[in-house]
Amino acid sequence: MNVKLPKITRRRSPEVLAPAGNLRVLKTAVDYGADAVYCGGAEFGMRAASKNFTLEDIEQGVRYAHAHNVRVYATVNIIPGNAEVAGMNAYLGALAEIGVDALIVTDIGILMAARQIAPHTELHISTQAGVMNYQAAAALYELGAKRVVLAREMSLPEIREMRAKIPGDLEIEAFVHGSMCMAFSGRCLISKYTTGRDANHGDCAQSCRWKYHVVEEKRPGEFFPVEVTDSGTYLFNSQDLNMLAHLDEVIAAGVTSLKIEGRAKGEYYVAALTNAYKTAVTTYLNGSENATDLARDDTFALPEWVLQEPYKVTHREYSTGFFYPEKTVGESITRGGYISDWLWLGTAVDYDTVTQRLTVLSRNKMVPGQQVEFLMPGTEPIPFQIPSAGIRDETGEMVNEINHPAHEFSFPCAQVIPPGAMLRGKAR
């Protein structure tokens, strides 16, 4: 392994923390504005479904991120058994040698081991630890924690109170977007019971999102009187969290890091949401004379295109989760499954300024006349219409449409489009 990489100096402004399930997604998150990225290795992280990193991948990711002044946090947040302790300790040492900026841990034993094995690496307490109060946060601080990732069940008033009662240099991280678990902070046995896949080892089958017909013991043969459709009920199915329009309140409550859930998600999902949340934070800071002023009275207004970004990725019905205590639990239960109104159609590979032709690597079918958008970092999406003529495949032959995934096509485009820009369009 190469020499330990230097860490990145932290920022004072709110941090946009993006997920990465593999090296390609990590680079996308960096390119689209993340201040920090969290990722997990092939072992000891809570997302077995994501294409996790090898140690070599993590090292490459740290190099790429640090070259762009972005921090990298490694998740080691499973709840380990005895047989995993020795391997875990060796893994902590390897991550420290690579130079990750922080370790995200749940288990108290891992926390104490990390203090000894990686004394110069920040320790962040995972949401799996279920930190719900200032006393628990302060105790973890005394044990060496630099940051606590709050349980998703905390409200804004509770976060404000915690911020006021914990040490000033103990940071608060909170999930602001993505999937929520119907169990407390992910402590669920449904997956283990129904499929044998252990959620506490990152292998949740999301059995809670299956369709169920619920029967109560004293009323055999009768559906439990909740909202039930012919296809069943999603009683256990949480809505997705979306706090984009309310980031000013989250920041004002004292949250240091704004976390996007989704280490099992792909490049397009991470690009769109990272870009949206980064734009929202920039809007917030530009509206304040002092970037550390957390008591702004002016109105936080985002451009409409930013507010629409969460609806252009695959999602479930959205809610504000538990941030507002006046909302009932039932308001966070979705009545259906995934919504996929927009598709990632392809990625820009090259633009020829002489011929004004754009080359794209396709992912989904595109046809002449189709209205699409280019998604690019730090800017509003650019509308575009697939031209009615002049489409060529990778052999240079003229074709009528783009209909082969993972193939390169080119077509006329007057707008200069940089490599890495993503094309998307409404599902047809």
Regions found by a protein language model. Give the residues of each.
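Alpha-helix capping/helix-boundary segments
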Residues: 109-110
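Glycine-rich loop at the start of a catalytic domain that most often binds anionic cofactors/ligands
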Residues: 50-55, 86-92
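Gly/Gly-Pro- and Ser/Thr-rich, intrinsically disordered tail segments characteristic of DNA damage-repair
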Residues: 86, 123-132
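Conserved phosphotransfer cores of two-component systems
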Residues: 118
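Glycine-rich, positively charged N-terminal anion/phosphate-binding segment
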Residues: 47-66
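Surface-exposed amphipathic alpha-helical tracts and adjacent flexible/coil segments at the periphery
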Residues: 1-32, 36-39, 43, 61, ...
